[in-house]
């Protein structure tokens, strides 16, 4: 497999994470570069590990994973997105004097890791297919991790810009994006199955 193909795989596998990162960045209150880099590192590490896991599991797990990966991603992203939308609705209308609105909001490690895992389940299935190609899985994992790191970091900062434009309702937008990403994953897999 050519280096160009590996980089294309890396960016293709990071698109779901990028979309989720835009949602996370929009939901955060003024995320700083360190927040974006932290999210990028968490997503990048998870996205790098999952194809290796898939590669190790090999052909035996392929049919099991491909049968359920889209449902797992849909449920995880749907639940996280719904939770974010409900939290955004409970926050009430924007208030310039609201002390909470001035306090930066960070997403916890568990929330970022769960979202990172949900957006990387497909990468595990790709890893299974890579087990049958002439490719060094370590190189692929590093490239995928770096691509995801850069895409998620950029996504969080892009989400910040969107969040500043729409205020506290950004959490609703972020949750909606996660639900849409999960729904698209489900739709793509169900559409491919027919």
From Swiss-Prot:
Localisation: Cell inner membrane
Protease among keywords: no
Transmembrane feature ranges: 3-23, 37-57, 69-89, 110-132, 147-167, 172-192
Keywords tagged on the record: Cell inner membrane, Cell membrane, Ion transport, Manganese, Membrane, Transmembrane, Transmembrane helix, Transport
Pfam families listed in its UniProt record: Mntp
Membrane topology category: Multi-pass membrane protein
UniProt keyword DNA-binding, yes or no: no
One function term, GO molecular function aspect: manganese ion transmembrane transporter activity
Signal sequence region: none
GO CC terms in record: plasma membrane
Origin: domain of life: Bacteria
Principal place of residence: membrane
PANTHER family recorded: MANGANESE EFFLUX PUMP MNTP-RELATED
HAMAP family the UniProt entry points to: MntP_pump
Protein family according to the UniProt entry: Belongs to the MntP (TC 9.B.29) family.
Function as written in the Swiss-Prot or TrEMBL entry: Probably functions as a manganese efflux pump.
Protein's recorded name: Putative manganese efflux pump MntP
Gene, per the UniProt record: mntP
């Amino acid at each position: 497999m050519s280096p160009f193909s590996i980089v294309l795989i890396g960016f293709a596998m990071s698109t779901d994470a990028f979309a989720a990162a835009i949602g996370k960045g929009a939901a955060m209150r003024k995320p700083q570069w360190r927040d974006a880099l932290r999210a990028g590192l968490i997503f990048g590490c998870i996205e790098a590990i999952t194809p290796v896991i898939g590669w190790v599991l090999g052909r035996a797990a392929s049919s099991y994973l491909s049968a359920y990966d889209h449902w797992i991603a849909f449920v995880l992203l749907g639940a996280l997105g719904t939770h974010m939308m409900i939290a955004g609705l409970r926050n009430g209308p924007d208030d310039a004097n609201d002390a909470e609105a001035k306090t930066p909001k960070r997403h916890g490690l568990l929330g970022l890791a769960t979202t990172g895992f949900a957006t990387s389940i497909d990468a595990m299935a790709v890893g299974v297919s890579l087990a049958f190609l002439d490719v060094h899985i370590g190189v692929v994992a590093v490239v995928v991790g770096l691509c995801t790191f850069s895409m998620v970091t950029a996504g969080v900062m892009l989400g910040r810009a969107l969040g500043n434009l729409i205020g506290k309702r950004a959490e609703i937008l972020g949750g909606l994006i996660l639900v849409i990403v999960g729904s698209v994953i489900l739709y793509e897999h169900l559409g491919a199955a027919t």
